[in-house]
Amino acid sequence: MKDILVVAKLKEGKFETFMGFMKSEEGMNERRKIADLTKTLGTVSPDKSAVMFKIAVHDEDAMYSFLDGSNPVSKPIFDEVMESYEIFELNKI
């Protein structure tokens, strides 16, 4: 597994829609394909315009598909809510 940090900027007023999907059964099933959810840490900016997740990824291709719009489950919601995202690989020191 690889530790990855994802920072996403959300379209204005779309935080609740984003989190609704991420917590839904459909969203959780897709996220399980990517990472160990028991090791996921998340936070949100005070104005709810950005989210950050540290995830323990076991399928990087699925992660990229989930984020870039090529996953048919996440695409409709991410087209609606996502402004941009950045992915960082984390290394323990």
Regions found by a protein language model. Name each.
Residues 1-73, 83-93:
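Short S/T/G/P-rich N-terminal loop/turn motif that feeds into the first structured element of a domain
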Residues 77-79:
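Short, exposed beta-strand-loop hairpins at the edges of beta-sheets
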